[in-house]
Structure formats: C-alpha cells, structure tokens
From Swiss-Prot:
Keyword presence, Transmembrane helix: no
Keywords: Oxidoreductase
Organism for this UniProt entry: Pyrococcus horikoshii (strain ATCC 700860 / DSM 12428 / JCM 9974 / NBRC 100139 / OT-3)
Organism phylogeny: Archaea, Methanobacteriati, Methanobacteriota, Thermococci, Thermococcales
Any Pfam family hit: TPP_enzyme_C
Subunit organization: Heterotetramer of one alpha, one beta, one delta and one gamma chain.
Gene giving rise to this polypeptide: vorB
Protein name, as recorded: Ketoisovalerate oxidoreductase subunit VorB
C-alpha cells in the first residue's frame, strides 16, 4: 500500500526524544516545543547554549536538565560569543563541528537576548564565519522577566511597559526585522520557521546542519502567558501568523530567497484573524489595526519582490 503524502511528511520528524517531560514551561509554551524539535533534529551530539531567558528556567538549574544533550548556561548578551568560542575550542581539539557526523553547536536565545541585548555578539558570530547554528525563538517580548517589550514586540501590543488602557500607551513601533539584519551580513543560510509547521522547521534545521559556516533561524514561538491567549490556541495562533503573512516562512541561501508558505498563491488572511485570539491586542483601535495590516502587506510584497529578483 502506498503511503499518503501527508503521512510521508509527518515521518520526516524524528521519533527520538531528547527533551524530557516534567520541565517547568508554561502550558502551551511555543519555546519548549521548538527546543524539543531542535533536539529531535540534532540528537544528543549537540551543545546547546542558552542565555538568561525563559529557556534557562525550562531547561532546569544545574545539575539538573530537561535536555538529553550538553547544556551551557550563559549571560544575557553573550550567546553569539559563547557559541563562537565553543566551536573554535572544539576545532582546536580536533573535533569535527557541524555536518551530519559532527558536533552541533546551537545558540538558543529569545528575541530580547537576540534583537536587543545580544545583537552585537550575533553580528560578530556571523562575521567571523563560525560553524554553528543560532536560533532566535521569537515570543515577541521579555517574557521571563515580566512581559516587557522588546524590539521584536509588534505594533499595537500590550506589555507591562506598553500597558494600553485609557492613555493608550501601546507599542507604537513595528517589529524589528532581525532576519534582514542577519542577511545583510551575507550569511550562508538564514530562515524563518514556526512551531505550527514542524516539518518545515525540521527541514530547515537539517539544511542548517549541512551548510558550512554560520546559520540563523528565527522561530515564531507563541507565549500564551505573555500574549494573554488560551493555552490550547498556541498552534492555531502560530499558524495564523503565517497565513496572514504577519510572519511569512522563507529561506535565504547563498544570496537567493525562497518563500516556503504552505499555500503560496493564496492571498493572506486579514490580520484581525491573528489578533482576535490574543488579549495583548485588545486595546488596539480600528486605526491601529489598519496600520498593522498596511505594514504586514507592504512587508509581504517586499519579500515577494526579493524572491522574484533574487530567487
């Protein structure tokens, strides 16, 4: 009997589990799901570097760990520097780094520790050309320290320091395009991914493993706690982020762009479908929604042009 295509696609997700149950993540945590997929893709022969963030708590305090892999806790700003040093040290000792039979060095940092505090170290890691993978799990705020805004927080969002209410003190800046900054370094491989599309994420992790030099993946990872969303809606929200083109899926490989949307010819859904499931957007006015929708569609058209010209 021939295996259906949908089943074949599911079989691309490895069965091996290297992220143990009983960790301290909140229910519906997108970051913990993403980390589980990383360890499925790369296995135990992996060194995971985690700065100060939610994942530090989720992984567990020394000497305990929810990861069946090597774990290195580091300071907030230093993920890019530490994975650079580990990679260089392994090579100095004669170990093979990256590739299917090499040791995988992975930086796993949130948007605050990447887009803000860790941007300089990330830039240096890419510029020096280290054989490692940097993954920014993007939950769009400093969730571990109390839901403060980051430069990856979207326009119109409530956080504890953009509180909305009668004075309407919402986030009024659009989300920083971190992946564009990374691509400006002419990195060999960069991609966006989402926990709602695990097969696509696994494929990109495997590609990052094979391509020499630095790789970067920006992973959309909902936080029900910070987004004021039901814990059973994380995957639906992540899927709508893609379907509305708020967070489009694409790859940049050696100067070429490729869009990976599930239905690339389908028009994006209205941004309201993404917003309405999250309490963090409840203070937005009609004008706010229109401003965000305009930005999303402009960015989507820009990405399509890049893929057309540099595809």
């Amino acid at each position: 009997m021939e295996i259906p295509e949908e089943v074949k696609k599911r079989l691309t997700i490895p069965f091996e589990e290297n992220f143990f149950a009983g960790h301290t993540a909140c229910q519906g945590c997108g970051a913990s799901l993403g980390l589980r997929y990383v360890l499925k893709a790369y296995g135990r022969k992996t060194i995971v570097v985690i700065p100060a963030c939610c994942s530090t708590i989720i992984a567990g305090p020394w000497p305990y760990s929810a990861l069946n892999a090597n774990l290195f806790h580091t300071a907030f700003a230093t993920t890019g520097a530490v994975i650079s040093g580990i990679e260089a040290g392994l090579k100095a000792l004669g170990y093979k780094v990256k590739g299917e039979d090499g040791i995988m060095v992975v930086g796993w940092a949130g948007d605050g520790g990447t887009a803000d505090i860790g941007l300089q170290a990330l830039s240096g890691f890419i510029e020096r050309g280290h054989d490692a993978v940097y993954i920014m799990y993007d939950n769009e705020a400093y969730m571990n320290t109390g839901i403060q805004r980051s430069s990856s927080t979207p326009y119109g969002a409530w956080t504890t320091n953009t509180p909305g209410g009668k004075r309407h003190l919402l986030e009024k800046r659009h989300k920083k395009k971190v992946i564009d900054i990374v691509i400006a370094h002419r990195i060999p491989y960069a991609a966006t991914a989402s926990v709602a599309y695990p097969e696509d994420f696994i494929r990109k992790l495997k590609k990052a493993q094979k391509i020499p030099g630095p790789s970067f993946i920006q992973l959309f990872a909902p936080c029900p706690t910070g987004w004021r969303a039901p814990t059973d809606k994380s995957i639906e929200i992540a899927r709508l982020a893609v379907q509305t083109a708020y967070f489009p899926l694409f790859e940049y490989e050696n100067g070429k762009y490729k869009i990976n949307m599930p239905n690339p010819k389908k028009e994006p859904k209205p941004i309201e479908e993404f917003l309405k499931l999250q309490g963090r957007f409840k203070y937005m006015t009609k004008e706010d929604v229109e401003a965000l929708q305009k930005w999303v569609l402009e960015e989507w058209e820009r990405l399509k042009k890049l893929a057309e010209v540099f595809g």
